[in-house]
């Protein structure tokens, strides 16, 4: 079977294994679309996206328009003569003329089991909500937000200690496997899209920096999910009695009882509204991350003392 003529549209690290899978599956990836270079690092130099760098390494032409709403950009896209466009965390809205241009349409790799967690942050919201399973949905795109009919789905379990980065990586690899299978099925005419169920729709709102603040009046299980969901970004923190903003990079829920925000015996353990949270790795402003024992050596407070401002 002859390979398909494709464009790939993606931007962050999540999308790179998917591009690699397409390039290695015998398809012709004739163009990659990604977001424009952004200032990054201490020098705020313009940096190309991870997908941009990978596409250049693969020798694939790269386009990075700020928008696809203009007639010129849409005409350039249509002129590619695509069988299909594969989209994975691109970050730009695709207008209807773009969605309609490829022969087989635009196919999205979405990091949830639709219709649960439509939207911008499905990985983090699944962990935050305490879901036991996540997954990837390969769907045909339409104008609505992640509302299109589904082609393939694959599950990925969320364990009690799974963090956002580990789930991100597992879903990216799952997406890479599923998109190859989906394209094979589409090319052979043996794959039929199914409408999403009307029940079970939830939305994964975009992450905000202020969501990282830890409120120890909440129960420990909720705070544990918050740390696992929001590390590395937006990151979790609390205001310590020293006046510093202390980052929490890793934690675990444990048994314990006390006034919320006070220290309990057993490492850097903080009482919560219900249970306690042991802070395994923390970071003071401008300092390297340390484990709880190392932090306590510089913060000699006995159990019962308040650590949270």
UniProtKB/Swiss-Prot annotation:
| Enzymatic reactions | L-methionyl-tRNA(fMet) + (6R)-10-formyltetrahydrofolate = N-formyl-L-methionyl-tRNA(fMet) + (6S)-5,6,7,8-tetrahydrofolate + H(+)
InterPro entries from the xrefs?
Fmt (IPR005794), Formyl_trans_C (IPR005793), Formyl_trans_C_sf (IPR037022), Formyl_transf_N (IPR002376), Formyl_transf_N_sf (IPR036477), Formyl_transferase-like_C_sf (IPR011034), GART_AS (IPR001555), Met-tRNA-FMT_C (IPR044135)
Enumerate the residues binding (6S)-5,6,7,8-tetrahydrofolate: 112-115
Q: Which PROSITE patterns match?
A: GART (PS00373)
A Gene Ontology molecular function term of the record: methionyl-tRNA formyltransferase activity
Write down the top EC class of this protein. Answer: transferase
GO annotation, cellular component aspect: cytosol
Listed A to Z, the keywords are:
Protein biosynthesis, Transferase
> Which region is the signal sequence?
none
Domain of life of the organism encoding this protein: Bacteria
Q: What is its EC number?
A: 2.1.2.9
Into which family does the record put it? Belongs to the Fmt family.
Please describe what this protein does: Attaches a formyl group to the free amino group of methionyl-tRNA(fMet). The formyl group appears to play a dual role in the initiator identity of N-formylmethionyl-tRNA by promoting its recognition by IF2 and preventing the misappropriation of this tRNA by the elongation apparatus.
The protein's name is Methionyl-tRNA formyltransferase
Origin organism of this chain?
Rhodospirillum centenum (strain ATCC 51521 / SW)
